Every structure is written in C-alpha cells, then in structure tokens.
C-alpha cells in the first residue's frame, strides 16, 4: 500500500438526535502519535452531552481536523490516520492491519506512546482554555508524575490577569440553553401567576416513607401531584404551533415532564417520559436516576429532549421565589420556591408553617388567566392534602 493509499480520513461521526455540529473540548492525541483501534481521539461537546470519540483505525496521526474549542460540522474531517504497515510497529514486529471496527467498538486497547504534550486531564485542559492559560508554559504540574492540576491552572490564571475581560466562549449545553431562552423571550407572550402553599401534610407524608423509600422526596411528591393537576388541566400541557393552515394549539396526550438540573456543564433538563403512567414510587425512582445521570454526565440525548411541561426547582438552591423562563416551545413552566417556616394565619392566629411559593409562567396565546388560576388552585389543594391523591404509594 502506497503512502497516500494508506492514509484514512475519519469524519466527525453522526451522534444522533439531529445534532449537526460538535465542539472539540479536548484532544487526547497529537500529530505523530500512534493510536490503536477504539483508543480515544478526543472529547467533543454537543448541545446535549459530552462524549469521547474513539479511533476506528490503528495507525499514526497525520493531521487533526481542528483545534480545541473549534466547532466542526458532522461529516467534516476529524483526523487523518496513516494505517500503513510501517506506521505502527506491532509487538511481533509485523505491520499493523488497517481494520475499521465501527464507532464505539468494545475492543480492549493499550495506551500508545504520547508526544511531549503537557500532562493534564480533559477537564483541566478545558479550564485552561477558558482562562487563557498556556499549559505548555507550565511545563510540569504539581500532581503525581507532573500532571497539571486544576489548582495549577487557577494559580497561573491569577498570576497572569491583565486589564482585559475574561473572554469565555459559549458552546455546547450553554449555547443551546441560551438559544432556547432567547427564542422563548422573542416568540412567547408570557404572564405569570403565583400561589403560596402550606406543605405541612406533604412533609408529614414524606416522613412516613423516608426510611423505606428515600427517593420519595418532597420534590418527587410535588411532581406526582403536578402530573395529576396537568391531567385535569390539559391546556397547560400543550404547544402553540404556527402551521400552514393557521395558528393551532397541540394538546399533548402524554405528560413528558422536564425539570431543571444544575450541573458542572451547565443547566440540563432531563425528561420523565409518560409521567402520567408512573405511580409515585416509579416517578420518584426515575427522577433520582435522571438527577444522578445529569450530575455524572451519563444521560443520553434521548433523555434530554421531548418535554411537554417543565419544572424549575430553584427552591433547591435556597431561593424563595422566582420567575422562570418557558422552555420553548412549551405552553407553561412551573417554578418551585424553597420550603421554609413562614407566618400564616390559622383560625385567626398567626402561626409558623412550612410553606412554598409556586409560580406558573404561561403562554398567554394558549392559556388564559382563569385556566391558570384553576390549575394553580387545584395543585395547591393537592399539595396541602396529598394523602388521598397519592393512594398509589
């Protein structure tokens, strides 16, 4: 095989879910490195998740298709690899066989030799890029074996701060969130309604099950009651559509419940599909799984799309009240404030009770004030007397 014939081009793979571009967050190889089949070439960030892309060939890296931070289209050249018999020496002295095993193969590999690139984990390289720290200038880090650590990068950034701004590129999850929020603000005429809810019975119910079913949290119980209220007030679980036949409201048969989850990568919205078909334990377990997956970065794109109604639980961050932005193109979003003891009037006396503020922001083209009032009052009543509604526990 001639030199040119042995060079294989590997394009950015189609990662599914309609994604059209990726951002290269970290290269694990450099030009001149030897790679083996299924060895990680780089990490890329999409609008949904961060994934590692493995090599389908064994050989030597000839060219990289972009630098860290570059945005590459699906199908664009990611790397060029020389798979010729002289490119990589095998343990038995024979030439390597250029074998394409397909994206995501499970073949075990050994790490190939590296060039003299600074030693740092992908997340540290990403931080260094955001802070404009040259890893090569650090030479050797304080970690084991000279690995450059997060502390090394932060120390270098503090020492080299100039008069200019800290420029941080927006891509991946952050870019997708910004796009949806901007679209929501531009296209949806919103209004809001709030109610204060006494949560004493909700917390008592949670306490009864905390030992046997710790996943049944006040948040999970509230979501289950929300699903009940949405099934009785279906207009909140809908979407405004400008079709060729004129404006339409699409009322969704299934409640696909999204909820905001703050992660190191930004705000994610995991989705509980067909929440109306789950009992309280099933819903609570699924919510716990999705929260864990969001924090660990293991959610699939399918678990982050398709919501018909979204909940913003800013109360989990200690915030009493707020006005969330509708997750376009949904018709409404519900904000949950923190549950705290607050003064309320009971039987003519002021007493302390655990309360929570619920705020519904809604698309006023789809829903009118009376419909939202009915929905919010029903949800308040369910939360204040939850036991009968949750007989499926």
From Swiss-Prot:
<feature type="domain" description="Peripheral subunit-binding (PSBD)">
    <location>
        <begin position="119"/>
        <end position="157"/>
    </location>
</feature>
<keyword id="KW-0012">Acyltransferase</keyword>
<comment type="similarity">
    <text>Belongs to the 2-oxoacid dehydrogenase family.</text>
</comment>
<dbReference type="GO" id="GO:0009274">
    <property type="term" value="C:peptidoglycan-based cell wall"/>
</dbReference>
<feature type="modified residue" description="N6-lipoyllysine">
    <location>
        <position position="48"/>
    </location>
</feature>
<dbReference type="GO" id="GO:0031405">
    <property type="term" value="F:lipoic acid binding"/>
</dbReference>
<dbReference type="InterPro" id="IPR050743">
    <property type="entry name" value="2-oxoacid_DH_E2_comp"/>
</dbReference>
<dbReference type="InterPro" id="IPR000089">
    <property type="entry name" value="Biotin_lipoyl"/>
</dbReference>
<keyword id="KW-0450">Lipoyl</keyword>
<feature type="active site">
    <location>
        <position position="368"/>
    </location>
</feature>
<dbReference type="GO" id="GO:0005886">
    <property type="term" value="C:plasma membrane"/>
</dbReference>
<dbReference type="GO" id="GO:0043754">
    <property type="term" value="F:dihydrolipoyllysine-residue (2-methylpropanoyl)transferase activity"/>
</dbReference>
<dbReference type="GO" id="GO:0016407">
    <property type="term" value="F:acetyltransferase activity"/>
</dbReference>
<dbReference type="Pfam" id="PF00198">
    <property type="entry name" value="2-oxoacid_dh"/>
</dbReference>
<comment type="function">
    <text>Component of the branched-chain alpha-ketoacid dehydrogenase (BCKADH) complex, that catalyzes the overall conversion of branched-chain alpha-ketoacids to acyl-CoA and CO(2).</text>
</comment>
<dbReference type="InterPro" id="IPR004167">
    <property type="entry name" value="PSBD"/>
</dbReference>
<keyword id="KW-0808">Transferase</keyword>
<dbReference type="InterPro" id="IPR011053">
    <property type="entry name" value="Single_hybrid_motif"/>
</dbReference>
<feature type="domain" description="Lipoyl-binding">
    <location>
        <begin position="7"/>
        <end position="82"/>
    </location>
</feature>
<dbReference type="InterPro" id="IPR001078">
    <property type="entry name" value="2-oxoacid_DH_actylTfrase"/>
</dbReference>
<dbReference type="InterPro" id="IPR023213">
    <property type="entry name" value="CAT-like_dom_sf"/>
</dbReference>
<dbReference type="Pfam" id="PF00364">
    <property type="entry name" value="Biotin_lipoyl"/>
</dbReference>
<comment type="subunit">
    <text>Forms a 24-polypeptide structural core with octahedral symmetry. Part of the BCKADH complex, consisting of multiple copies of BkdA/BkdB (E1), BkdC (E2) and Lpd (E3).</text>
</comment>
<dbReference type="InterPro" id="IPR036625">
    <property type="entry name" value="E3-bd_dom_sf"/>
</dbReference>
<dbReference type="Pfam" id="PF02817">
    <property type="entry name" value="E3_binding"/>
</dbReference>
<feature type="active site">
    <location>
        <position position="364"/>
    </location>
</feature>
<dbReference type="GO" id="GO:0005737">
    <property type="term" value="C:cytoplasm"/>
</dbReference>
<protein>
    <recommendedName>
        <fullName>Dihydrolipoyllysine-residue acyltransferase component of branched-chain alpha-ketoacid dehydrogenase complex</fullName>
        <ecNumber>2.3.1.168</ecNumber>
    </recommendedName>
</protein>
């Amino acid at each position: 095989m001639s030199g040119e014939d042995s060079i294989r081009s590997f394009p950015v793979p189609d990662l599914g879910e309609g994604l059209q571009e990726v951002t290269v967050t970290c290269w694990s190889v450099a030009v001149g490195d030897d790679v083996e089949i299924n060895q990680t070439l780089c990490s890329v960030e999409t609008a949904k998740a961060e994934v590692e892309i493995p090599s389908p060939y064994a050989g030597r890296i000839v060219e990289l298709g972009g630098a860290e931070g570059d945005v590459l289209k699906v199908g664009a050249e990611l790397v060029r690899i020389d798979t010729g018999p002289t490119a990589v020496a095998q343990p038995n002295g024979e030439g390597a066989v250029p074998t394409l095993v397909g994206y995501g193969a499970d073949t075990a590999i050994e790490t190939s030799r590296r060039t003299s690139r600074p030693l740092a984990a992908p997340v540290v390289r990403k931080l260094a890029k955001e802070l404009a720290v040259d890893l090569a200038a650090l030479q050797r880090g304080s970690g084991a074996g000279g690995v450059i650590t997060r502390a090394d990068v932060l120390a270098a950034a503090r020492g080299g701060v100039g008069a200019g701004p800290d420029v941080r590129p927006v891509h991946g999850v952050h870019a997708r969130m910004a796009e949806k929020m901007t679209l929501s603000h531009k296209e949806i005429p919103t209004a809001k309604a709030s109610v204060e809810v006494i949560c004493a019975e909700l917390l008592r119910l949670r306490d009864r099950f905390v030992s046997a079913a710790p996943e049944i949290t006040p948040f999970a119980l509230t979501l289950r009651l929300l699903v009940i209220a949405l099934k009785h007030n279906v207009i909140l679980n809908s979407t405004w559509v400008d079709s060729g036949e004129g404006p339409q409201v699409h009322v969704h048969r299934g409640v696909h419940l999204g909820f905001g989850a703050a992660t190191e990568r930004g705000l994610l919205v995991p989705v509980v599909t067909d929440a109306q078909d789950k009992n309280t334990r099933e819903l609570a377990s699924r919510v716990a799984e999705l929260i864990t997956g969001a924090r660990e970065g293991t959610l699939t794109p399918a678990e982050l799309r398709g919501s018909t109604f979204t909940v913003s639980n800013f109360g989990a961050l200690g915030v009493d009240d707020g006005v969330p932005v509708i997750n376009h193109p949904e018709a409404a979003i519900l904000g949950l404030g923190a549950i705290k003891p607050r003064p309320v009037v009971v039987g003519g006396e002021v007493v302390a009770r655990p309360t929570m503020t619920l705020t519904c922001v809604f698309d006023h083209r789809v829903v009118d004030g009376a419909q939202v009032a009915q929905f919010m009052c029903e949800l308040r009543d369910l939360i204040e007397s939850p036991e009968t509604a949750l007989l499926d526990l």
